[in-house]
Regions:
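Conserved beta-strand hairpin/beta-sheet module of binuclear metal-dependent hydrolase folds
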Residues: 1-47, 133-149, 166
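Structured catalytic core of nucleotide-sugar glycosyltransferases
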Residues: 10-20, 61-69, 122
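Active-site neighborhood of phospho(di)ester-bond hydrolases with catalytic His/Asp-centered motifs
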Residues: 32-35, 55-63, 83-86, 145-148, ...
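Active-site metal-binding motif and surrounding structural segment of the metallo-beta-lactamase
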Residues: 39-85
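Active-site environment of divalent metal-dependent phosphoester hydrolases
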Residues: 65-68, 90-91, 129-130, 152-155, ...
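Metal-dependent catalytic neighborhoods of phosphoester/phosphodiester hydrolases
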Residues: 69-78, 93-95, 228-235
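Metallo-beta-lactamase
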Residues: 86-141
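Cap/insert and terminal regions of metallo-dependent hydrolase folds
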Residues: 155-255
Length: 268
């Protein structure tokens, strides 16, 4: 990696109310998901001193509203390209509205797409959406991996994402809070199931299975507003990892994300 051209990123928003992550190099600026209103994403970008008019493309993980809500308006307003797989395009067409054909691109699951100086890798996950996939972003031998919205982490996925430099990993719910909370039983079953979301404990287990000597940053993401707390997610993951002899905040930093506040800029 050259000193002048790191991969930089900020997790603009992460949670059950909306998700968006911004990444840049000297050549390209992209979003992974745009799950808030266009106005909210504009505001989040301004908080990190960046403008949406400089963003080249949005890479969409799946059609749930908290991941695609702003895709259509941003594509129309700023002329961004939009990448998603065929199943996601079919499922989100009514949510995102009309996007010019020349801005729409298919990103096949479990492939790598060269996007200028970025290599973007898609991988399928287990979630109750049409064809959900998440992404690893590779640049100059550095890798940032995003994995939220999955009911479990398969051996195939674990092998794909092992030893990235940084992760945004799902810690959606505390299992007891969810079980005792106000959600209907069918909704609780959906969240707890193999096509639902990772609990704090499951997120910790997944991290212990995939991080390696290159891993320096871990962000805990997609936290439920109703079934989790920031302090609880952080403490649970840190405690489990420390119990298994991981040196949290020494070998790597364990960071939190917020639903309406961007993270500081991180540099890989």
């Amino acid at each position: 990696m050259t000193e002048n051209d790191p991969l930089r990123y900020s997790i603009l928003a992460s949670g059950s109310t909306g998700n968006a992550t911004y990444l840049e190099t000297s050549q390209h600026r992209i979003l992974i998901d745009a799950g808030l209103s266009g106005k909210k994403i504009e505001n989040l970008m301004s908080q990190i001193d960046r403008s949406l008019k400089d963003v080249d493309a949005i890479f969409v993980t799946h059609e749930h509203t908290d991941h695609c809500h702003g895709v259509g308006v941003l594509a129309r307003r700023y002329g961004m390209s939009v990448y998603a797989n065929e199943g996601t395009w079919q499922a989100m067409v009514n949510k995102v509205g009309n996007i010019p054909d020349e801005q729409k691109f298919i990103f096949t699951p479990n492939t790598v797409k060269e996007f200028g100086d970025l290599d973007i890798e898609s991988f399928s996950v287990s979630h109750d959406a049409a064809q959900p996939q998440f992404y690893q972003i590779h640049h100059d031998n550095k890798t940032f991996c995003i994995l939220t919205d999955t009911g479990y982490v398969s051996d195939r996925v674990a092998g794909t994402i092992r030893n990235a430099d940084a992760y945004l990993m799902e810690c959606n719910h505390d299992t007891e809070m969810l079980r005792m909370g106000p959600y209907s039983w069918p909704l609780k079953q959906r969240i707890l199931g193999d096509e639902g979301h990772l609990s704090n404990e499951e997120g910790a287990d997944a991290l212990m299975n995939v991080i390696g000597d290159r891993t320096k940053e871990i962000f805990l993401g997609h936290r439920s507003q109703h079934n989790n707390m920031r302090s609880l997610a952080h403490l649970t993951v840190a405690s489990i990892m420390e119990d298994h002899d991981f040196a949290v905040d020494q070998d790597f930093k364990l960071e939190d994300t917020e639903p309406e506040t961007p993270s500081s800029f991180m540099v890989l």
